[in-house]
Amino acid sequence: MAFLIMSSAAAVATGTNAAQASMIAPFTGLKSATSFPVSRKQNLDITSIASNGGRVQCMQVWPPINKKKYETLSYLPDLSEEQLLREVEYLLKNGWVPCLEFETEHGFVYRENNKSPGYYDGRYWTMWKLPMFGCTDATQVLAEVEEAKKAYPQAWIRIIGFDNVRQVQCISFIAYKPEGY
């Protein structure tokens, strides 16, 4: 029995010596700054300065009068048919499910059910038919947009990309606005 205890203690002692032999040297600090080149080119470019004071003069304020906000990038010009097609192809390429929604009264952001600021603004859009599960052709989605435009010419229509694995909406953009907006 004593032999058994001795041999296990000896095995532990030899195991620690092997571990200590393969240890990495401890951190000794940073190298001396004298080994790095000191000459620097003076940068006079205004965009590299930490302050944005020089850029303030070229900024413009978004005019809020008669400029309703629809979605995140609603300040951009309307998408052309080709741009819509490319957006839907991007949506499909990422494996998201295209859905169409429309709103007949308030296509822009407003507060109705909740008065706090933030993402939730009280809008509920009506879904056009069912989500297009299994859709692989962007032209099918645009054909549905055309059908929705014929049925509701005075409605806002948006396309949503829904990730059915993560259960989240990944993309949303306005595909059609009524005349005058």
From Swiss-Prot:
Localization per Swiss-Prot or TrEMBL: Plastid, Chloroplast
GO MF annotation, one: ribulose-bisphosphate carboxylase activity
This protein's record includes keyword Oxidoreductase: no
Domain of life assignment: Eukaryota
Keyword Protein transport: no
Gene Ontology cellular-component terms listed: chloroplast
Family the entry assigns: Belongs to the RuBisCO small chain family.
Record's subunit section: Heterohexadecamer of 8 large and 8 small subunits.
Protein name, UniProt field: Ribulose bisphosphate carboxylase small subunit, chloroplastic 2
Source lineage: Eukaryota, Viridiplantae, Streptophyta, Embryophyta, Tracheophyta
Name of the coding gene: RBCS2
